[in-house]
C-alpha cells in the first residue's frame, strides 16, 4: 500500500525532471524562439530637426545642414567631410559638397569647374 501512496510522487518527480531536460534542449536547439523586435525606421517628421535648429544659438550664421556656427555661409563645413569635398561656387558665396566616391584626386574639382563654365 505504501508503494501506491508514493507512486504519484515518483511520477511527478520523473515528469518534472524530463521537462527540465527538454526545456534545456528546446532552448539549446532553437525551440520556443523568442520574437526579436526589428529596429524601426526613423519617421519622416522634420520636427526633431526643427527643434534642434530652433534651439541652436549662433551670433553669426547657423549652417542649416550641419548646425555649425560660422562667420559666413561659405565657411559651412560639409555634413560628411570624410566622403565629400567642399567647393565655393564663386568667391565668398555659397558652397556645395560633392561626393568623393569614384573620382580620382582632383576629378571632382575639375567637374565642378566645367559645370560652373557651363561645359558639363
UniProtKB/Swiss-Prot annotation:
Disulfide bonds: none annotated. GO terms for biological process: ERAD pathway. Residues 1-20 form the signal peptide. It comes from the Eukaryota. Coiled coil: none annotated. Keywords: Signal. InterPro entries: LCL2. Belongs to the LCL2 family. Probable component of the endoplasmic reticulum-associated degradation (ERAD) pathway. This is Long chronological lifespan protein 2. It comes from Colletotrichum graminicola (strain M1.001 / M2 / FGSC 10212). The gene is LCL2.
Amino acid at each position: 500500500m505504501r508503494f501506491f501512496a508514493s507512486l504519484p510522487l515518483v511520477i511527478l518527480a520523473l515528469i518534472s525532471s524530463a521537462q527540465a531536460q527538454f526545456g534545456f534542449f528546446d532552448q539549446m536547439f532553437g525551440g520556443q524562439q523568442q520574437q526579436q523586435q526589428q529596429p524601426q525606421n526613423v519617421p519622416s517628421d522634420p520636427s526633431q530637426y526643427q527643434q534642434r535648429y530652433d534651439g541652436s544659438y549662433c551670433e553669426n550664421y547657423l549652417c542649416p545642414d550641419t548646425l555649425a556656427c560660422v562667420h559666413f555661409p561659405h565657411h559651412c563645413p560639409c555634413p560628411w567631410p570624410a566622403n565629400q569635398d567642399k567647393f565655393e561656387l564663386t568667391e565668398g558665396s555659397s558652397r556645395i559638397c560633392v561626393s568623393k566616391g569614384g573620382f580620382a584626386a582632383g576629378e571632382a574639382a575639375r567637374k565642378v569647374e566645367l559645370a560652373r563654365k557651363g561645359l558639363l
